Structures are given as structure tokens and as C-alpha cells.
Amino acid sequence: MSRRLVWDSNACDDYLWWQAQDRKVLKRINQLIQDVLRNGNEGIGKPEPLKHDFAGYWSRRITDEHRLVYKIADVEIRIAACRYHYGR
């Protein structure tokens, strides 16, 4: 089943920031998103489930400092953030 990709406004702003600032990181984000679309909560970037306020969301490592935060639902994958660490 194919899921559609949905971007929260903050995540969209993060993505646009990376387009202007660092193409290498942008390429990594794109790789992680493609892997989420293919493999769900398994694969590259050390996927881990988040807890507390972010229960239901997962994160993957973009760099040592930055994480891709997302949630997989029946019909969509929601990207919540792709800059900084979760909760920042």
C-alpha cells in the first residue's frame, strides 16, 4: 500500500532551510524519507520510537545534531521535523 507524504509547517520550513544551507544534509534527509516510505520503522538512520509528548512518533538520525521526526499512519506518513533534536 502506498502512503502519501504530509509535511507539518515547521518540518516544511526546516526542509526549505536545508535547501538553502546544506545540500549534503538535504540529500541525507531525502534518503531517510525514501527509506521510511519503503521500510516503515526499520532501516537506515537508527530508527527509534519516541516517548512522552512524542509517543507514536519515530526519529531517525540525520546527523549527530539533527533528527528526522515522523509518524506513520494508515494512509500517510507525517513529517514533523527535520532539523534539530526532537522537542526543540
Regions found by a protein language model. Name each.
Residues 2-4, 10-27, 31, 44, ...:
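Enriched for short, Lys/Arg-rich terminal
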Residues 34-61:
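A short, surface-exposed loop/turn module that caps and links secondary-structure elements
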